[in-house]
Amino acid sequence: MSDIGVYNAAFGPDRAGLRNLKRVFWNLEAPSLYEQALQRGEAQLAAGGALVAETGIHTGRSPKDKFVVRDSGTEDQVWWDNNGAITAEQFDRLHADFVAHAEGKDLFAQDLYGGAEPAYRVRARVYTEYAWHSLFIRNLLIRPERDALGAYEPDLTIIDLPSFKADPARHGVRSETVIACDFTRKIVLIGGSSYAGEMKKSVFTYLNYILPKAGVMPMHCSANVGAQGDSALFFGLSGTGKTTLSNDPARVLLGDDEHGWGPKGIFNFEGGCYAKTIRLSREAEPEIYATTERFGTVMENVVIDPVTRLPDFDDASKTENTRCAYPLPFIPNASATGRAGHPKNIVMLTCDAFGVLPPIAKLTGAEAMYHFLSGYTAKVAGTEKGLKGPEATFSTCFGAPFMPRHPSVYGNLLRDLIARHHVDCWLVNTGWTGGGVGTGRRMPIRVTRRLLTAALDGSLAKADYRRDPYFGFAVPTSVPGVEPHILYPVKTWADKAAFAETAKRLVEMFQANFKRFEAHVDADVRAAEPTMSIAA
């Protein structure tokens, strides 16, 4: 085996069981990784300088193919209702087969950090079969200084082999695709998928497992910081506006996806962004658009013209989940440290396609925990499913696939931190108003931004409020610059009876979903549930 690049020879591939490799390319930077990816036919060069790769049959994550080793260390720690389990023996066979599959191959290794706060960061070493995967994860995680690589000792090892195919009978998995996490031995194996997001989410999953033990709250959220040092968190599932709304020219961007909240404040887990590009426009999101025209950015499943190499961000023929991955410094107003003080505001974003939630509501600590555990949004059902109306989605903690522990662990941590630091909490509906999908309209972005500005500058906390008769939370009666009727969802509907019926239906969905958490929360959180006595 020959080595190319800088690394700590005392912690070589043998520490991960890897042997008889052809070559290992250590900690290569973007120019070298471009050369390797292009020479190997892994990717193409776009007109603006970005590297463009396709992921094949997997154009998104494979949550049903993700497994955690169930052993004495994890038996009572992992939420097994939400996490697939394999035995240590099955993992041993899988690992042995990964090692055998890697023999004679070139691998690319990156030594990186997950976590901008040194006291809580994890040193993640990522071995990849593809050069473009190596560039992707280098963009997404935090890059150590060059002179630190010689002494780098990994805490977590990820082996990413897209050409490996798992054997369900032998390995105890579901298909040829596998993401297997051994928290005890600190190894993650990814096989059968070229979707690069599996790597970053594996680091996130590991941090979500280890940090609560240290009293640190891991969060699937974006974050930004105001001119006075006031930080804000934005929770939200895909399509709710998490990336767009946190990317505010008047505030410093801390990060777009994963953060921790510890004794000193909040910190980014990552050193880059993984933004959706479908229907991306220069006018609507100029900062993100500009990254697609830069050398160093990786674009995933974006269609490019074979002659001009210009990207077509409106083309969803490969997938709706087209992405670009770039280092945070590519965003002009990004934080240089990835750290900030304790948040002053928490915003929980939902895209309510039923059109019955108000555009903003102020939450108590108990209500914030209720809605955090619920993790509600709604999506418009695709015609291929034959559904005419919206489809409710409840993803606890706004990121159920990445949460190894029971949601109450994260919910209690969040509630304690909210109380300790006197954080104002808000529920913001970026979905529909005046009716649901088909009869109403999307909440105007100018309204959402005006409401967020008022929430983040502190003025909205002093407003007059009414109690929502269906969902129980406090809704402002007026906000300067916002039409008063839009704050009263029922007033935006022409058919008041249809509004009442739709609101009642959504209330029932909340109640049915929350039954699984009732035994794990205090009475005041149970009391924060939407009130059917009025909705009936």
Curated annotation (Swiss-Prot):
Catalytic activity: oxaloacetate + ATP = phosphoenolpyruvate + ADP + CO2
Similarity remark: Belongs to the phosphoenolpyruvate carboxykinase (ATP) family.
SUPFAM superfamilies with a match to the protein in the record: PEP carboxykinase N-terminal domain (SSF68923), PEP carboxykinase-like (SSF53795)
A molecular function (GO) term: ATP binding
Binding site for substrate: R61, Y195, K201, R323
Subcellular location: Cytoplasm
Positions annotated to bind Mn(2+): K201, H220, D257
Cofactor: how bound: Binds 1 Mn(2+) ion per subunit.
Keywords from the UniProt entry: ATP-binding, Cytoplasm, Decarboxylase, Gluconeogenesis, Lyase, Manganese, Metal-binding, Nucleotide-binding
Gene Ontology cellular-component terms listed: cytosol
InterPro entries the UniProt entry points to: PEP_carboxykinase_ATP, PEP_carboxykinase_C, PEP_carboxykinase_N
UniProt-recorded name of the protein: Phosphoenolpyruvate carboxykinase (ATP)
GO biological process, one term: gluconeogenesis
Residues binding ATP, per UniProt: K201, H220, G236, L237, S238, G239, T240, G241, K242, T243, T244, E285, R323, T448
Pathways per UniProt: Carbohydrate biosynthesis; gluconeogenesis
EC numbers, comma separated: 4.1.1.49
CDD domains (UniProt xref): PEPCK_ATP
Superkingdom per UniProt: Bacteria
Organism: Methylobacterium sp. (strain 4-46)
Cited function: Involved in the gluconeogenesis. Catalyzes the conversion of oxaloacetate (OAA) to phosphoenolpyruvate (PEP) through direct phosphoryl transfer between the nucleoside triphosphate and OAA.
